[in-house]
């Protein structure tokens, strides 16, 4: 399927009929590419201006949510109206990846060059003391910025929502945040230098970290916070996708043009899929 000249991340709609692709351009492009997965054809692109550099991408609550790295922002696109319907600035450098809770009330982002994680919360603000007598509460968004390591990019929130793990590419450290307390709780010297993506397994018991620099896949036990396995994926491990049924993980090897399949019980590479050049972002498309 034809997309833009610099596709990075991909996501499918909840009904599995439409895919969205961010066309990144190092923060300078302004396009979401759209694909009809049923007819297998490209649909008209979405112009994200004034938001530039769309990268991280999720589909939640009927909308496509994305980071806009070049504009230090996040935004959302509503397929029902065909419009960009919301945006919020982070003020952080290289707002790159994001996670949106199922109710779309909280958004997490990694800000790579700032070395921070943003927690954006949809909040009901109560009237202040100087407000008129008939003033009503109003909705607004608040931001909590948590310092982590420089180069923190890949991250994930545990299935139960109790932990956020992110890995810093520069020093290979893993930072663990309590989302409820909005505080850094722990650091792990994971030695995952070049960390690119991080994903919890569907049961929440392991964390997978890919290294684009070394081609390794680091597997950590969540309870003990210890490395339990390390697999050589190829010359550069990138995107990670978990099978929702908990049986497999798919890991893109960008430098080798294949996607490795890892069995989640044995934690062994069982197969690989030869794909096009420089695979990176991966997504499930599930149709009822």
Feature locations, PLM:
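Predominantly soluble domains enriched in secretory-pathway, periplasmic, or organellar proteins
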Residues: 1-288
